[in-house]
């Protein structure tokens, strides 16, 4: 049986916290679809195409070692509809703290009501990454701070390149 899971987020940028969830998800599925939420009204740091390339470069090799195929695609609208379109029966969510759990448990309940065939699986953040958020990474990087402990190398290089062109 081909187990397909969908992990959605903005991934702007991809962080080591996201990688932690992706690594955990790879242990329970044969194919992981990373769905990049595309919101036309928001002004992201990286375009959807840039984020997709960064996710691919950051994840492809280590997922191959785990026999998990990776695909990255944008999605608009509801995560359960994106899961259905991808053939996924599992939604992956990461939890950093109790606040995340409260929100994600409500979302899982709503998703189950809309799509009972799709299950939500939660992965609790590893101790070393529970404090990382993409918002804080963007803010620290914008102020010239060192984010090397918070993002994978391809993302770090992209942030550095962006700061040179924007600064």
Swiss-Prot record:
The gene is coaD. PANTHER family: PHOSPHOPANTETHEINE ADENYLYLTRANSFERASE. Its EC number is 2.7.7.3. Pathway: Cofactor biosynthesis; coenzyme A biosynthesis; CoA from (R)-pantothenate: step 4/5. ATP binds at residues 10-11, 18, 94-96, 104, 129-135. It is an enzyme of class 2 (transferase). Belongs to the bacterial CoaD family. One of its GO terms (biological process) is coenzyme A biosynthetic process. The record marks 18 as: Transition state stabilizer. It comes from the Bacteria. This is Phosphopantetheine adenylyltransferase. Keywords: ATP-binding, Coenzyme A biosynthesis, Cytoplasm, Magnesium, Nucleotide-binding, Nucleotidyltransferase, Transferase.
